[in-house]
Amino acid sequence: MAREYSRVDRIGDQMQRELAQLIQREVKDPRVGMVTVNDVKVSRDLGYADIYISLLSTEELTEDSPEVQDSLTVLNKASGFLRGQVGRAMKLRVVPHLRFHFDKLLGQSRKMDRLIREAVGDKPAVPRDDNDDPVSDNPERDA
């Protein structure tokens, strides 16, 4: 019977917090923009950890954007340093190899949101009728 919150899940969550702080404080390369660590998926044998990141930007970014490619290159090259720091912070005997990926989910959710707004337009979700208000502050109306 599988547990709801396994050790691998707990390690992934803790790695996400540690990596977010390390990238913000320790990685000094200017090619790395404002990185957000969205998710960490750790393999069952703790051999690998896939880290999904997104970048803060004013424009829509894709995996092929130069900013994204530069950030991924720097982070993958710094993965050995980051792996050592994570291992020391978490006191793990076996520290997974880190693989950084661009998280496409944010772009897909923005696209879905835009499509929904275009389909719905300016229509309110529920038409409102002031006469159907069950609670009234007007005592004359209640009398």
Curated annotation (Swiss-Prot):
Keywords: Cytoplasm, Ribosome biogenesis
Keyword Cytoplasm: yes
Compartment list: Cytoplasm
Cytoplasm in keyword set: yes
GO biological process entries: maturation of SSU-rRNA
GO cellular component: cytosol
SUPFAM superfamilies listed in its UniProt record: Ribosome-binding factor A, RbfA
Compositionally biased residues, Basic and acidic residues: 119-129
Superkingdom per UniProt: Bacteria
Role summary: One of several proteins that assist in the late maturation steps of the functional core of the 30S ribosomal subunit. Associates with free 30S ribosomal subunits (but not with 30S subunits that are part of 70S ribosomes or polysomes). Required for efficient processing of 16S rRNA. May interact with the 5'-terminal helix region of 16S rRNA.
UniProt subunit comment: Monomer. Binds 30S ribosomal subunits, but not 50S ribosomal subunits or 70S ribosomes.
The protein, known as: Ribosome-binding factor A
Classification of source organism: Bacteria, Pseudomonadati, Pseudomonadota, Gammaproteobacteria, Pseudomonadales
Gene (name only): rbfA
